[in-house]
Amino acid sequence: MILNSSTEDGIKRIQDDCPKAGRHNYIFIMIPTLYSIIFVVGIFGNSLVVIVIYFYMKLKTVASVFLLNLALADLCFLLTLPLWAVYTAMEYRWPFGNYLCKIASASVSFNLYASVFLLTCLSIDRYLAIVHPMKSRLRRTMLVAKVTCIIIWLLAGLASLPTIIHRNVFFIENTNITVCAFHYESQNSTLPVGLGLTKNILGFLFPFLIILTSYTLIWKTLKKAYEIQKNKPRKDDIFKIILAIVLFFFFSWVPHQIFTFMDVLIQLGLIRDCKIEDIVDTAMPITICLAYFNNCLNPLFYGFLGKKFKKYFLQLLKYIPPKAKSHSNLSTKMSTLSYRPSENGNSSTKKPAPCIEVE
């Protein structure tokens, strides 16, 4: 917990009554190394995703719009990652000034909300494409997808405004270091509680429930299709993919959300045990690595569910340029069905059930 604040030379001076919390030599070595790996892999992977979707696939489907924006949001975050690597390697000493502190912190917050919102919209799009293919044709347009992405970027920016306002550079007097951090006055609990609950609920709980519901309904629809076509072999890999998508999202973000909430309790003074604070401050950067590394892999993960994405991705790696006139589209592995149950749940029994194809 931080207390006893004063201002001098434009930098707020504060006291930290748990100055050793989270400060371990292995953290100062391991975390910058992980950040560096995430930076290299993320920049390389997401840049290739942008090139494949925009230049090879020509951005012709709703899913491709969401994946392109997902990759762009990740790239915005990744560009600030070297700052955090240096910050951690310097034992949490921030040398870049107040403006970069705000920008880098806002980038982290922005990526969290933008990525989660885009993944949620992608799950809704898959639900509409598979469960309600006929009814959703007028809704699943490129214009709607682009407008949705604009709204998502605006909402993510709005959700990041408190970070820009309240994240600052502070000088901790009893450790003689300058940090980039949030600082809450103990008598004002509205701000930290609001930020923490917003991150937990808007940044995880609601999106996870929507994603879980969407893919559960997709699961049921595909299962019903396989039951009708009893003479066709069931492709269990589709169901494994659905399960992997839900579990991938859940386990990527749950640890970070838990320790974020505990950190808010510490800032409010509700947790005053330095041992617990040490656990939280030590675990926080590790959960950040887990969450954001998986986040940066999402465009590749979702993209490789489509056969055409894999085809063009390999072409790019072989330096094969895109064709001048391309009519390719992005279809995730669950987006195209040659057989679809009718919207009211009834299916014709006069004709043999056609083969189900999932790309």
Curated annotation (Swiss-Prot):
User: Which PROSITE patterns does UniProt cross-reference here?
Assistant: G_PROTEIN_RECEP_F1_1, G_PROTEIN_RECEP_F1_2
Q: Which GO terms describe its molecular function?
A: angiotensin type I receptor activity; angiotensin type II receptor activity; bradykinin receptor binding; protein heterodimerization activity
Can you tell me where the transmembrane regions are?
26-55, 62-89, 99-125, 142-165, 191-216, 240-268, 279-304
Task: Please list the tissues where expression of this protein has been recorded.
Answer: Adrenal medulla, cortex and kidney.
SUPFAM superfamilies listed in its UniProt record? Family A G protein-coupled receptor-like
Spell out the Pfam families in the cross-references. Answer: 7tm_1
Q: Which residues bind angiotensin II?
A: Q15, D17, R167, F182, H183, Y184, K199
InterPro entries per UniProt: ATII_AT1_rcpt, ATII_rcpt, CCR1-9-like, GPCR_Rhodpsn, GPCR_Rhodpsn_7TM
Changes after translation: C-terminal Ser or Thr residues may be phosphorylated.
Disulfide-linked positions: C18-C274, C101-C180
Glycosylation positions in this chain: N4, N176, N188
What the entry lists under Gene3D superfamilies is as follows: Rhodopsin 7-helix transmembrane proteins (1.20.1070.10)
Annotated segments matching region Disordered: 336-359
- Note whether Transmembrane occurs among the keywords: yes
Query: Which superkingdom does the taxonomy of this entry point to?
Result: Eukaryota
Instruction: Pull one GO CC term from this UniProt entry.
Output: plasma membrane
Comp. bias (Polar residues) = 336-350
User: What family is it from?
Assistant: Belongs to the G-protein coupled receptor 1 family.
> Under which name does UniProt file this protein?
Type-1 angiotensin II receptor
Which organism is the protein's source?
Answer: Bos taurus
